[in-house]
Amino acid sequence: MDKIIKTLSKSGHFRAFVLDSTETVKTAQEKHDTMASSTVALGRTLIANQILAVNEKGDTKITLKILASGAVGAIISVANTKGQVKGYIQNPDLDYKRTATGEVIVGPLVGNGQFLVITDYGTGHPYNSMTPLISGEIGEDFAYFLTDSQQTPSAVGLNVLLDEEDKVKVAGGFLLQVLPGATEVEIARFEKRIQEMPAISSLLASENHIEALLSAIYGDDDFKRLSEEEIGFVCDCSKDRFLDALASLPKADLQEMKEEDKGVDITCQFCQTHYHFDENDLEELING
């Protein structure tokens, strides 16, 4: 079970989210059959979107798009306020590692591009916000987005660790934000702690990485846990939803599918679930 823990410093001037997204990224890897670099890039995007979405309320949905010039192409993710996320990567077959360390390469494969966030409040008027990719590592790009676009000083760490067979071993991250009222002394103390923090990969490799993240963020500062919530990879696709999409096509196209193809097969991009619509399904749409 994946989870997110929301916390607030005793002073009320800092808040932090810590996430275990291991099963989320495992599921994404299994559904899309991604190779190492693609797994890490997609996983980081899913974690970033979980953080963005749980920060919203109600039925808001967040679409995060990494529109990259590099080999990954585009990474698309959609999440709701419960931290339920789905996503896919345009190129799932990237597998590049540094020869000396075996470290999975992501940044150069993402390259330049845009970090685009679409916030849908359900009003019919989604809000778009976009910043340039500054490193392609996604975590740094996410932090830049929060600071530049949302005007909220933030520290972010997120990563995906793979085992020797390139399967997801652990995935997760954190978000630390400065809230109104924080003093310069407090900010300096937290900044120093973040600068001296071990690499996110080593924290995730800890036996209890959630507690390791909290300890690294807060040190000796007191904090309270506001909530602990389940999160995960969840796709809300259905045969009825795709049937509605087919119903929007011209009847001549539906007739052609029925007569020439004897039906139609559709695969959900987000979860790779296959749906088959036979001649009877198409006939009902044509006569509907």
Curated annotation (Swiss-Prot):
Localization annotation = Cytoplasm
Q: Which domain of life is it from?
A: Bacteria
Please give the positions of the paired cysteines in each disulfide bond: 235-237, 268-271
Please verify whether the record's keywords include Disulfide bond.
Answer: yes
UniProt's post-translational modification comment states: Under oxidizing conditions two disulfide bonds are formed involving the reactive cysteines. Under reducing conditions zinc is bound to the reactive cysteines and the protein is inactive.
Its main subcellular localisation, reduced to a broad class, is cytoplasm
- The family this protein is said to belong to: Belongs to the HSP33 family.
Functionally, this protein is described as follows: Redox regulated molecular chaperone. Protects both thermally unfolding and oxidatively damaged proteins from irreversible aggregation. Plays an important role in the bacterial defense system toward oxidative stress.
User: What's the protein name?
Assistant: 33 kDa chaperonin
The scientific name of the source species is: Streptococcus suis (strain 05ZYH33)
